[in-house]
């Protein structure tokens, strides 16, 4: 089972991706994780990508395509791609790779939330720069405002979590996703799920769809 999962900032797609990975035994490939690892390495490429993100801009397609395709070459089947492709050029790169290697996508899933929900979820996030603990000023606040419960360090707001940056990211996402959604809808594999509400409620909307696809794939393998 090969899945693409999309969603605007704060949609919860990465959380659901990990649940899907664990439940269905898929390999999780996240464009965000690959980018963050490169930034943490403080390589010249990482610094270049960090500059784009701090402005709320998308990282150039050539960079993202290289990161993702390199990862896919090590995992031909049974994957979930989180946050990729997100531009028409990335779609072309991915589709060419899949065609060349005889790989079929089963689902392009979008978890949708509106712009104000995206801003509330993301701009309230606070990170501990020392131990990596994550908080939210509304949904998961620290015991002492601005201070990490775990190590006592002062919490920070990441540059790309600021409200003005989140709104810019949301609008870029919405604009770029229009042709991508149209493409995968035409292929008959696009499904949009309402991402509003608690994670557990959203999962109840997603799971029946994945169970159906998983069951279909298992039956297909039995008859091969």
Swiss-Prot record:
InterPro entries: Adenyl_kin_sub, Adenylat/UMP-CMP_kin, Adenylat_kinase_CS, Adenylate_kinase_lid-dom, P-loop_NTPase. Keywords: ATP-binding, Cytoplasm, Kinase, Metal-binding, Nucleotide biosynthesis, Nucleotide-binding, Transferase, Zinc. AMP binds at residues 31, 36, 57-59, 83-86, 90, 158, 169. It catalyses: AMP + ATP = 2 ADP. GO terms for cellular component: cytoplasm. One of its GO terms (biological process) is AMP salvage. The keyword Protein biosynthesis does not apply. The keyword Nucleotide-binding applies. It is an enzyme of class 2 (transferase). Pathway: Purine metabolism; AMP biosynthesis via salvage pathway; AMP from ADP: step 1/1. GO terms for molecular function: adenylate kinase activity; ATP binding; zinc ion binding. Its EC number is 2.7.4.3. Residues 30-59 are annotated as: NMP. Residues 124-161 are annotated as: LID. ATP binds at residues 10-15, 125, 134-135, 197. CDD domains: ADK. Belongs to the adenylate kinase family. This is Adenylate kinase.
């Amino acid at each position: 089972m090969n899945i693409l999962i999309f969603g605007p900032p704060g949609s919860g797609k990465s959380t659901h991706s990990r649940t899907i990975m664990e439940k269905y035994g898929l390999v999780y490939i996240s464009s965000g994780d690959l980018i963050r690892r490169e930034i943490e390495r403080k390589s010249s490429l990482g610094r270049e990508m960090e500059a784009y993100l701090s402005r709320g801009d998308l990282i150039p397609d050539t960079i993202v395509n290289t990161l993702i395709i390199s990862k896919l070459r090590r995992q031909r089947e049974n994957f979930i791609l989180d946050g990729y492709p997100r531009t028409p050029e990335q779609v072309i790169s991915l589709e060419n790779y899949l065609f060349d290697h005889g790989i079929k996508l089963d689902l392009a899933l979008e978890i949708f939330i509106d712009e104000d929900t995206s801003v509330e979820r993301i701009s309230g996030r606070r990170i501990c720069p020392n131990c990596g603990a994550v908080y939210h000023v509304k949904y998961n606040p620290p015991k002492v405002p601005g201070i990490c419960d775990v190590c006592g360090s002062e919490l920070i707001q990441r540059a790309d979590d600021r409200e003005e940056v989140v709104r810019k990211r949301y609008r870029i996402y919405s604009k770029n996703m229009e042709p991508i959604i149209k493409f995968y809808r035409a292929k008959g594999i696009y499904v949009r799920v309402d991402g509003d509400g608690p994670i557990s409620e959203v999962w109840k909307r997603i799971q029946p769809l994945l169970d159906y696809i998983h069951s279909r794939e298992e039956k297909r393998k039995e008859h091969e």
